[in-house]
Amino acid sequence: MKLSLFIIAVLMPVILLSACSDHAEEHASINTKKTVENITDVRKTAKTSIDWTKPSGGEYPDIKQKHVWIDVNVKEQKAYIKEGSNTIYTMMISSGLDQTKDDATPKGTFYVEPERGEWFFSEGYQEGAEYWVSWKNHGEFLFHSVPMTKDQKVIKTEAEKLGTKASHGCIRLTIPDAKWVYENIPEHTKVVIS
């Protein structure tokens, strides 16, 4: 009888505390896991603004003696300067909104056309841009800087969209990236947009 009372009085609380402790650890583990998942979700959805006044990929490559082409990935919102299958530079872009056929970036293989310039302004869109290079329809679809007002001031609300679908169909770039394309990418350079 004394042994039974000893088991009930002493060992039972120890067993119960041990079980509760394991259960508490399980809850702590689940809560920690959920917290980590929530932090990860916030990081996935938090958008880091791209500085449109700087090159988006660091130091530019020397391509004077190289045969390059441009691979535009609309899903990733990046333009890859490639030599063969090797990526030699990556630029952040904004392609067309893709909400209608009028604001979509055409997909396919194109070639840089002879039209290019240091500045344009569209009365219809009330937006302009620096350093434009045509790649389709001789001045309709362009690589160019982030949008600007008629007096050549950056439209910050539009520039802050760099890295997301935001344009009327053109490929927006940081100002230095657009200038580099304007100065370095020759006519007839292949442009693949997918």
Curated annotation (Swiss-Prot):
Q: Which UniProt keywords apply?
A: Cell membrane, Cell shape, Cell wall biogenesis/degradation, Glycosyltransferase, Hydrolase, Lipoprotein, Membrane, Palmitate, Peptidoglycan synthesis, Signal, Transferase
Q: Which family, according to the similarity comment?
A: Belongs to the YkuD family.
What protein name applies here?
Putative L,D-transpeptidase YciB
Q: Which InterPro entries match?
A: LD-transpeptidase, LD_TPept_cat_dom, Transpep_catalytic_dom
Expression induction or repression: Repressed by zinc via the metallo-regulatory protein zur.
The major lineage groups are:
Bacteria, Bacillati, Bacillota, Bacilli, Bacillales
**Pathway note:** Cell wall biogenesis; peptidoglycan biosynthesis
| PANTHER family assigned to the protein according to its UniProt record, in alphabetical order | L,D-TRANSPEPTIDASE, L,D-TRANSPEPTIDASE YCIB-RELATED
Query: Domain of life here?
Result: Bacteria
Q: State the annotated membrane topology for this chain.
A: Lipid-anchor
Which residues, per the entry, are lipid-modified as N-palmitoyl cysteine?
C20
Pfam families reported in the protein's UniProt record: YkuD
Kinase recorded as keyword:
no
List localization entries: Cell membrane
Residue numbers with lipid attached (S-diacylglycerol cysteine): C20
GO (cellular component) term, any one: plasma membrane
As given in the record, the signal peptide range reads 1-19
Question: What EC numbers are recorded for this enzyme?
Answer: 2.-.-.-
Q: Where is the L,D-TPase catalytic domain?
A: 68-194
What is the species of this protein? Bacillus subtilis (strain 168)
Q: Name one GO molecular function term.
A: glycosyltransferase activity
